């Protein structure tokens, strides 16, 4: 067995753009033959995947699955809406989802490691970067889910509710984006931040501080209702709040998770004309 030196790994990284561990593995399998390692990496798609790794994957799918009292929600990203609809990409996301449910895996790094070889092969086949971005689990007496297309997914856990009610609550969460279950759940940090914003607005209107503070107190009650599930008007019957709906059914929501594709990812918009102009200057 040839010695796999650091300089050899470094050279392979520079020539392929692949990660250090991938290069070391390829060299070990090729018994230190760098040309054979490169050939094997090309065949496996590792080089193509490495080149795509820097591309922003902000599109993709949200998947949900419930098994009894346990549910998983998963986001898998690609670069375009076209690939998000690809059968191979969808099958890959479903396979990751099934594994997460079966193994109750909530550590995304574990999923990434488990499916890295399949991901690399899919990147080579499809030609876009693919990323298993996040996964979360929810447990409860009654679970419900809702998918708005493939871009928004929701899991809801409740007590004392039937499946239809939980489904309707999940639809509401998808549409209204609550951040907390009840107004009293809104964190002190969020309340303080909003209070300062509203106080600044009130003070700018020229009101005395005492009057401004009273105005803000009223606004804060409205704010905590707006960002909490039970304080929001129910989307299917806006004359009542979700809290009132739950009370009518003697039910309680114990948790919810809402994922939307690409949340928090800054998608780079390419100016094609500018890109061509820049390339022409380099040539």
Curated annotation (Swiss-Prot):
One of its GO terms (molecular function) is translation elongation factor activity. The keyword Cytoplasm applies. Changing residue 81 to A: 2 to 3-fold less active in promoting GDP exchange and slightly lower binding constant for interaction with EF-Tu. It is found in: Cytoplasm. One of its GO terms (cellular component) is guanyl-nucleotide exchange factor complex. It comes from the Bacteria. Residues 80-83 are annotated as: Involved in Mg(2+) ion dislocation from EF-Tu. Keywords: Cytoplasm, Elongation factor, Protein biosynthesis. GO terms for biological process: translational elongation. PANTHER family: ELONGATION FACTOR TS, ELONGATION FACTOR TS, MITOCHONDRIAL. Heterotetramer composed of two EF-Ts.EF-Tu dimer complexes. (Microbial infection) In case of infection by bacteriophage Qbeta, part of the viral RNA-dependent RNA polymerase complex, the other subunits are the viral replicase catalytic subunit (AC P14647), host ribosomal protein S1 and EF-Tu. Associates with the EF-Tu.GDP complex and induces the exchange of GDP to GTP. It remains bound to the aminoacyl-tRNA.EF-Tu.GTP complex up to the GTP hydrolysis stage on the ribosome. In order to produce high amounts of bacteriophage Qbeta RNA polymerase catalytic core, a fusion protein consisting of tsf-tufB-replicase with a cleavable linker between tufB and the viral replicase subunit is frequently used. This is Elongation factor Ts. It comes from Escherichia coli (strain K12). The gene is tsf.
């Amino acid at each position: 067995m040839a010695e796999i030196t650091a300089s050899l790994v470094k050279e392979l990284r520079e020539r392929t753009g692949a990660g250090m561990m991938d290069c070391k593995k390829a060299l070990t399998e090729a018994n230190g033959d760098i040309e054979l390692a490169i050939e094997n990496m090309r065949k496996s798609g590792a080089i193509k995947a490495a080149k795509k790794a820097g591309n922003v994957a902000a599109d993709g799918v949200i998947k949900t699955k419930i098994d009894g009292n346990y549910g998983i929600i998963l986001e898998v990203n690609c670069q375009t809406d076209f690939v998000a609809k690809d059968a191979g990409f969808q099958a890959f996301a479903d396979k990751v989802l099934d594994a997460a449910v079966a193994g109750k895996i909530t550590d995304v790094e574990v999923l990434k490691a488990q499916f890295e070889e399949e991901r690399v092969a899919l990147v080579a086949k499809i030609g876009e970067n693919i990323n298993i971005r996040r996964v979360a689990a929810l447990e409860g007496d009654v679970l419900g889910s809702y998918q708005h297309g493939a871009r928004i997914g929701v899991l809801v856990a409740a007590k004392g509710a039937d499946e239809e009610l939980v489904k309707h609550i999940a639809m509401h969460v998808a549409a209204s984006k609550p951040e907390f279950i009840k107004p009293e759940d809104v964190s002190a940090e969020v309340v303080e931040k909003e209070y300062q914003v509203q106080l600044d607005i009130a003070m700018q209107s020229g009101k005395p501080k005492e009057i401004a503070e009273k105005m803000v107190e009223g606004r804060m009650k409205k704010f905590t209702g707006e960002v909490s599930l039970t304080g929001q008007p129910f989307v299917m019957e806006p004359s009542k709040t979700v809290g009132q709906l739950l009370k009518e059914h003697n039910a309680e929501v114990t948790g919810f998770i809402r994922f939307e594709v690409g949340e928090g990812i800054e998608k780079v918009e390419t100016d094609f004309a500018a890109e061509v102009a820049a390339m022409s200057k380099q040539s």
